Structures are given as structure tokens and as C-alpha cells.
Amino acid sequence: MDPQLPEPEPLIALIEALRRLPGVGVRSARRMAYHLLQHDLQGADMLGRALSGAVQHLRHCARCNSFTEDEVCATCANPKRDPGLLCIVETPADQNMIESSHGYRGLYYVLMGRIAPLEGVGPRELDFQRVIERACDGVVQEVILATNFTAEGETTAHFLGDALSERGLKVTRLARGVPAGSELEYVDAGTIAWALMERRST
């Protein structure tokens, strides 16, 4: 006996589409679908139109690879940004986090991923040649590698760091330290050790 009640094809299609979101399993997708259809039809319509509009009108910036409606995004076109600094991040979300710190006024390049051999993602899939060409435009003086401190992020930073250093660019890496406001007993030993080694006078 089939334990799953039969569902209409449009509902199945919606659930499968929602499952494509990161961290969303079939149960969560089904709950979201039921909620939208039962309690928020207006929201469902807004979501559909917004997603369709984003797919149709957004593209990758010719300079930084982030999302934009125009050929060059507003950040890259901003004359107040420092063109000599280029910060390389994995995703637009990472870019937004760095921007929200208000401590960086240079430009960005968004990889839209990281090297992940088990997922079949390597330098070619991330178009590293384009990254290198962007960094070697004759204006950039320093490249800041701001990939995540995961195994994949470290591999990505190492690969890019070697490639860019060979071309005479100054390459730096985001420092890892004890997060502001945290208590040392709750910070892992590796982070504390690294923070001690990288300590500097204040």
C-alpha cells in the first residue's frame, strides 16, 4: 500500500522546485507549498512574479560577476570605490556581509562558488582565467582573498593566491580570529592558536 497520498501534478512540481533551495528537504518544501496555496495566495503570486522577473532581467556584471540589471553593476561603476583593491568572495551573500562591515571601500569579484572536487567544481568551472584577467588589469594593486575558512574555501584561496602571486600582485587573506563578543571557552582551539600567532600591537 502506497503510504503517500497522491498529489496533483502542479503541487508535485511546486514541491520539487522548492526542494532545489539549499537546506530544504521534501517535508519542508511540502509545508511551504501548502502554506502558500492555503494561506498566502497573494504571496505565492508575488513569489512567482519576482522569481520570473529575476530570471529574465538579472545577469552577471561584466566586471565583478555579481548580479545586476546592467552590464556593469552600481558598485563597480561607483567612482568613490578604490579600484586598487579587489576582494574575491565566493557568493553575493559573502559580498554583502563584507560590505555591511563598512570597513572595505574597494571593488569585488564574486566567484559564484568554490573549488569542490567531490562536486565536480574546479578552476575551469569557476572560470578562474576570468578572475586572473580581472585582477591583472593594471589597476589592481592588492587582491584580498575572502573565501570561507572551509576546506573548499582554503583550497580556492590557495589556488588563486599562487596564480596571482606569480603575476606580481600583492595577495592577502582575511584574518581569522576570535569573534568580537565571544568568550574564549566557547572558541575552538585552532581559532585561538591562530589568533595568538597573528596577534599585533594595538
UniProtKB/Swiss-Prot annotation:
UniProt source species: Bordetella parapertussis (strain 12822 / ATCC BAA-587 / NCTC 13253)
Family the UniProt entry places it in: Belongs to the RecR family.
SMART domains hit by this protein: TOPRIM
Main function: May play a role in DNA repair. It seems to be involved in an RecBC-independent recombinational process of DNA repair. It may act with RecF and RecO.
Protein name: Recombination protein RecR
Keyword line: DNA damage, DNA recombination, DNA repair, Metal-binding, Zinc, Zinc-finger
Keyword flag Coiled coil: no
Domain Toprim stretches: 84-179
Entry keyword DNA repair: yes
Gene name, Swiss-Prot/TrEMBL: recR
Pfam families registered for this protein in UniProt: RecR_C, RecR_HhH, RecR_ZnF, Toprim_4
Zinc finger (C4-type): 61-76
GO biological process, one term: DNA repair
Species classification: Bacteria, Pseudomonadati, Pseudomonadota, Betaproteobacteria, Burkholderiales
